[in-house]
């Protein structure tokens, strides 16, 4: 559960309504794979991830980034039940994929940076603070199965 004020909820919803999930998802996942190269081991089937340009131009990275942000959008619609919303994904990432739950926090922080880059002055300190709460809540929900 994420505790947001009505103003924070409105700010998150307003900005998220402008997000191009296809582009931002691919950029966020791509940046995660470039900045934290050890995360690439979970995506060996994606083909060439040998250079930043290869990662950022990889269609499988873009497609999976879109999928990730689609799930994130579902979370935004269920901020009062993030653990329930992400229960199956938490189980998948824990039991089958064996993803270090710290990677969820890293991706959330990368997403915040990508939003800041894409929205500039619209991404005010107040909007940033609200999104930090949201990505922290999503990361906690995704890590729930690990506990």
UniProtKB/Swiss-Prot annotation:
Matching entries from InterPro entries are given as:
Globin, Globin-like_sf, Globin/Proto, Hemoglobin_b, Hemoglobin_oxygen_transport
Asked whether the keyword Aminoacyl-tRNA synthetase is assigned, the reply is no
Per UniProt, heme b binds at 64, 93
Keyword tags: Heme, Iron, Metal-binding, Oxygen transport, Transport
Globin domain spans which residues? 3-147
The observed outcome of changing residue 70 to D is: In allelic sequence
Coiled-coil portions: none
GO MF annotations, alphabetized? haptoglobin binding; heme binding; hemoglobin alpha binding; metal ion binding; organic acid binding; oxygen binding; oxygen carrier activity; peroxidase activity
Instruction: Kindly indicate whether the keyword Amino-acid biosynthesis belongs to this entry.
Output: no
**What family name appears in the similarity comment?**
Belongs to the globin family.
Protein name listed in UniProt: Hemoglobin subunit delta
What is the organism field in this record? Ateles geoffroyi
């Amino acid at each position: 559960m994420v505790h947001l004020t009505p103003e924070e909820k409105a700010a998150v919803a307003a900005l998220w309504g402008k997000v191009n999930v296809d582009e931002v998802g691919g950029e966020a996942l791509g940046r995660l794979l470039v900045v934290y190269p050890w995360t690439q081991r979970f995506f060996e089937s994606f083909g060439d991830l040998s250079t930043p340009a290869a990662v950022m131009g990889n269609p499988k990275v873009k497609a999976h980034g879109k999928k990730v942000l689609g799930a994130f959008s579902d979370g935004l619609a269920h901020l009062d039940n993030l653990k329930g919303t992400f229960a199956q994904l938490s189980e998948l990432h824990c039991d089958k994929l064996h993803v270090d739950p710290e990677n969820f926090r890293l991706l959330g922080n990368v997403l915040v940076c990508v939003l800041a880059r894409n929205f500039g002055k619209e991404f005010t300190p107040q909007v940033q603070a609200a999104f930090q709460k949201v990505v922290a809540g999503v990361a906690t929900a995704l890590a729930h199965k690990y506990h």
